[in-house]
């Protein structure tokens, strides 16, 4: 089905019907004077739970219909975001935005809106009106690369479960031709494809190095500092700057891994009482930093979750929901330029370098005044110093008592 052109571009929107069961695969081809400027092919559906007039919850699944409009879709450029907007009649609309950076583009602000006033789609709905659900995920894709993901990506954003699969996507297409360079999603990769194997080469043989009982220690380089920011709509709600080094000590040979920001994607979300920063790359399925508000006055790092693949291809995962790091007043940021060690468990530590983080109350996309980690040390040293001083006084009192007692006893003997 070919739809009418958008101003400044042309959109071809095709629905494919596969097999006996309708599976509407969207193919979107936005064009400009040079040719294709945005290409997307994917499948999706949405499972929505809503309350009915008989005081029960009803769950429906909405797939892409065979009729849709595309008002508002655009190619974008260096200054303006690209976007795809799809309308499923009166009841449902869906949109995704793309922002171009120097070396990559971001996929963000995936928004689903559904109207429960449509009794055909939502029979017996109590809360009638338009409901909007925003997916907080933020993906980075290099320019001149097509992103592919055949696996089902599931996002549970209560009361909606969103599923996407069969994705072929490239925004800001260069020279009017879709790239042959591919970036495959992590879900399509197996541990054996992402686990690094170190080889040495000789003229006729290749030898895989294996750890020995007495490996020669080599210094681990300091990790590169990355900048991460999460947006809530058009407003930045979380900022983090840090170099990250992961240490796993349960292996026979400790596993140390530096996170490279250039090859790491990040997503997250912001809520009034909690905030999340999630990192992932080819070796890390996810690394979550979850922040919480304490006593309505301070924030702290409450939880860390990690799932990653080790050099031998095995998976490692750990979760700790009872942490208490990076404590600072709301409205400020937390900073620590020196190396810090976060003990998540006995087997897993995170070393941070040049850390600065603000998960709440970000103003104008900038960090607020920072509380330095040296203040934590001062707060820790003060009670130690006071305790030491009191201990010294107590020792002097006891010494004086025993000396006096001894003299008194000697006096009795002389008498």
Curated annotation (Swiss-Prot):
<feature type="topological domain" description="Cytoplasmic">
    <location>
        <begin position="405"/>
        <end position="415"/>
    </location>
</feature>
<feature type="disulfide bond">
    <location>
        <begin position="237"/>
        <end position="270"/>
    </location>
</feature>
<comment type="similarity">
    <text>Belongs to the LAMP family.</text>
</comment>
<dbReference type="GO" id="GO:0006605">
    <property type="term" value="P:protein targeting"/>
</dbReference>
<dbReference type="GO" id="GO:0005764">
    <property type="term" value="C:lysosome"/>
</dbReference>
<keyword id="KW-1003">Cell membrane</keyword>
<dbReference type="GO" id="GO:0005770">
    <property type="term" value="C:late endosome"/>
</dbReference>
<dbReference type="GO" id="GO:0070062">
    <property type="term" value="C:extracellular exosome"/>
</dbReference>
<feature type="glycosylation site" description="N-linked (GlcNAc...) asparagine">
    <location>
        <position position="361"/>
    </location>
</feature>
<feature type="glycosylation site" description="N-linked (GlcNAc...) asparagine">
    <location>
        <position position="317"/>
    </location>
</feature>
<dbReference type="GO" id="GO:0030670">
    <property type="term" value="C:phagocytic vesicle membrane"/>
</dbReference>
<keyword id="KW-1133">Transmembrane helix</keyword>
<feature type="compositionally biased region" description="Low complexity">
    <location>
        <begin position="202"/>
        <end position="213"/>
    </location>
</feature>
<dbReference type="GO" id="GO:0006914">
    <property type="term" value="P:autophagy"/>
</dbReference>
<feature type="region of interest" description="Second lumenal domain">
    <location>
        <begin position="234"/>
        <end position="379"/>
    </location>
</feature>
<dbReference type="InterPro" id="IPR048528">
    <property type="entry name" value="Lamp2-like_luminal"/>
</dbReference>
<feature type="glycosylation site" description="N-linked (GlcNAc...) asparagine">
    <location>
        <position position="322"/>
    </location>
</feature>
<feature type="glycosylation site" description="N-linked (GlcNAc...) asparagine">
    <location>
        <position position="115"/>
    </location>
</feature>
<keyword id="KW-0458">Lysosome</keyword>
<feature type="glycosylation site" description="N-linked (GlcNAc...) asparagine">
    <location>
        <position position="97"/>
    </location>
</feature>
<dbReference type="InterPro" id="IPR002000">
    <property type="entry name" value="Lysosome-assoc_membr_glycop"/>
</dbReference>
<keyword id="KW-0325">Glycoprotein</keyword>
<dbReference type="GO" id="GO:0046716">
    <property type="term" value="P:muscle cell cellular homeostasis"/>
</dbReference>
<feature type="topological domain" description="Lumenal">
    <location>
        <begin position="26"/>
        <end position="379"/>
    </location>
</feature>
<dbReference type="GO" id="GO:0031088">
    <property type="term" value="C:platelet dense granule membrane"/>
</dbReference>
<feature type="glycosylation site" description="N-linked (GlcNAc...) asparagine">
    <location>
        <position position="265"/>
    </location>
</feature>
<keyword id="KW-0072">Autophagy</keyword>
<dbReference type="GO" id="GO:0097352">
    <property type="term" value="P:autophagosome maturation"/>
</dbReference>
<keyword id="KW-0732">Signal</keyword>
<feature type="region of interest" description="Disordered">
    <location>
        <begin position="202"/>
        <end position="227"/>
    </location>
</feature>
<comment type="function">
    <text>Lysosomal membrane glycoprotein which plays an important role in lysosome biogenesis, lysosomal pH regulation and autophagy. Acts as an important regulator of lysosomal lumen pH regulation by acting as a direct inhibitor of the proton channel TMEM175, facilitating lysosomal acidification for optimal hydrolase activity. Plays an important role in chaperone-mediated autophagy, a process that mediates lysosomal degradation of proteins in response to various stresses and as part of the normal turnover of proteins with a long biological half-live.</text>
</comment>
<dbReference type="GO" id="GO:0008200">
    <property type="term" value="F:ion channel inhibitor activity"/>
</dbReference>
<dbReference type="GO" id="GO:1990836">
    <property type="term" value="C:lysosomal matrix"/>
</dbReference>
<dbReference type="GO" id="GO:0005765">
    <property type="term" value="C:lysosomal membrane"/>
</dbReference>
<feature type="glycosylation site" description="N-linked (GlcNAc...) asparagine">
    <location>
        <position position="29"/>
    </location>
</feature>
<keyword id="KW-0472">Membrane</keyword>
<feature type="glycosylation site" description="N-linked (GlcNAc...) asparagine">
    <location>
        <position position="312"/>
    </location>
</feature>
<feature type="glycosylation site" description="N-linked (GlcNAc...) asparagine">
    <location>
        <position position="57"/>
    </location>
</feature>
<dbReference type="GO" id="GO:0000421">
    <property type="term" value="C:autophagosome membrane"/>
</dbReference>
<protein>
    <recommendedName>
        <fullName>Lysosome-associated membrane glycoprotein 2</fullName>
    </recommendedName>
</protein>
<keyword id="KW-0968">Cytoplasmic vesicle</keyword>
<feature type="glycosylation site" description="N-linked (GlcNAc...) asparagine">
    <location>
        <position position="175"/>
    </location>
</feature>
């Amino acid at each position: 089905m070919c739809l009418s052109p958008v101003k400044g571009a042309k959109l071809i929107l095709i629905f494919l019907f596969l097999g006996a069961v309708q599976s509407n695969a969207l193919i979107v081809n936005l064009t400009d004077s040079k040719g294709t400027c945005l290409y997307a092919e994917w499948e999706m559906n949405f499972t929505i739970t809503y309350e009915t007039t008989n005081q029960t919850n009803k769950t429906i699944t909405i797939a892409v219909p065979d009729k849709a409009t595309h008002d508002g879709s655009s190619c974008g450029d260096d200054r303006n975001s690209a976007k795809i907007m799809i309308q499923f009649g009166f009841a449902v609309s869906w949109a995704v935005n793309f922002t171009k950076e120097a070396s990559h583009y971001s996929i963000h602000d995936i928004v689903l809106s559904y109207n429960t006033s449509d009794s055909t789609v939502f029979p017996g709905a109590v809360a009638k009106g338009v409901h909007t659900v925003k997916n907080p995920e933020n993906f980075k894709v290099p320019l001149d690369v097509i992103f592919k993901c055949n696996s089902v990506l599931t996002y549970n954003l209560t009361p909606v479960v969103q599923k996407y699969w069969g994705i072929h996507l490239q925004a800001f297409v260069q020279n009017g031709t879709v790239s042959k360079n591919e970036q495959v999603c992590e879900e399509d990769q197996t541990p054996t494809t992402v686990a690094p194997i170190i080889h040495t080469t000789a003229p006729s043989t290749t030898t895989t190095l294996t750890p020995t009982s007495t490996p020669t220690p080599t210094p681990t380089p300091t990790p590169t500092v990355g900048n991460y920011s999460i947006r809530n709509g058009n407003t930045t709600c979380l900022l983090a700057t840090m170099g990250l080094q992961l240490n796993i000590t349960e292996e026979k040979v400790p596993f140390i891994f530096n996170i490279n920001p250039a090859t790491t994607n990040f997503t997250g979300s912001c809520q009034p009482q909690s905030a999340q920063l999630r990192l992932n790359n080819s070796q890390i399925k996810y690394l979550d930093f979850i922040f919480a508000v304490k006593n309505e006055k301070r924030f702290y790092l409450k939880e860390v979750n990690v799932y990653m693949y080790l050099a031998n291809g095995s998976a490692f995962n750990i979760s700790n929901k009872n942490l208490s790091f990076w404590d600072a007043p709301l409205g400020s940021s937390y900073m620590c330029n020196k190396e810090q060690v976060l003990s998540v468990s006995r087997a897993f530590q995170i070393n941070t370098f040049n850390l600065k983080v603000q998960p709440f109350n970000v103003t104008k996309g900038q960090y607020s005044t920072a509380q330095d980690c040296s203040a934590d040390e001062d707060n820790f040293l003060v009670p130690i110093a006071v305790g030491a001083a009191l201990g010294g006084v107590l020792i002097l009192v006891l010494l004086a008592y025993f000396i006096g007692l001894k003299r008194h006893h000697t006096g009795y003997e002389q008498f």
